[in-house]
Amino acid sequence: MKQLTTYLPLLFLLLLGACKNAKTGSAAQLSDDALMDTVQRRTFNYFWEGAEPNSGLAPERIHMDGIYPEKDQNVITSGGSGFGIMAILSGIDRNYITREEGLARMEKIVSFLEKADRFHGAYPHWWYGDTGKVKPFGQKDNGGDLVETAFLIQGLLAVHQYYVNGSPQEQALAKRIDTLWRDVDWNFYRQGNQNVLYWHWSPEYGWAMDFPVHGYNECLIMYLLAAASPTHGVPASVYHEGWAQN
């Protein structure tokens, strides 16, 4: 039931298709397992086959005709890549690719992230995948994006747990991921030790975006990771006052 609820929008579309074909009696019957496999495989394919070549990370957009009027075919997204990383783990576990192929891709990703632009440990929303330099998301949004960083870090931590007790090569990768996780300075993004986390910081414009993040919305993971950080953990008051607004 939990799986079915998770993929309810897709199921709704499938049911619409079934209703449309009801007159011909050709409606396809999908079991819960078959539905799950279809969603996982197609999600995996997007992030595996569509990855930006140099970084292994997720492009901000893919134009199926190969035409990019804005010349942005190499622009990659940090938060979307966090979800893509977890999709690749699913692909390994479901034998869509070998464990060795998955590890090679993860090593490419981590090698890129170790060298790519970061801002007090936090990643920007976009990079140029061929250089690792920040691609501004907006005029004053050319630095750290703490929400997108959280989406990326949660994916990396899933990889860490997948490999931490594996082969020596896998354990070495898990250790490198742990360093990236520990480098994120969540406390810095409190802007002067306020009891709230700020979404953006720019080395050029500072706190000009001025976006304190309050609940409740999709940004909860940012507060959870900030509280859990072994190196830059925030006090409970940041969660209670900033997120829950108690």
Where are these regions (language model features)?
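Active-site-adjacent structural elements in enzyme catalytic domains
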Residues: R42, E100-K115, Q139, D145, ...
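Membrane helical hairpin/interfacial module
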Residues: Q73-G82, M86-N142
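Extended ligand-binding clefts on enzyme/binding-domain cores
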Residues: D33-L35, G121-T149, N165-N246
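Well-ordered alpha-helical scaffold segments within catalytic/enzyme domains
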Residues: A27-L35, N45-Y46, G82-I97, F112, ...
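Bacterial N-terminal signal peptides that target proteins for export
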Residues: M1-L8
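C-terminal motif of bacterial Sec signal peptides marking the signal peptidase cleavage site
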Residues: L15-A18
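Low-complexity, Ser/Thr/Pro/Gly-enriched N-terminal "stalk/linker" regions
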Residues: K23-I76, H120-A122, W127, A227
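Aromatic- and histidine-enriched alpha-helix N-cap/loop-to-helix transition segments
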Residues: V39, V75-M86, G144-Q154, P212-N217
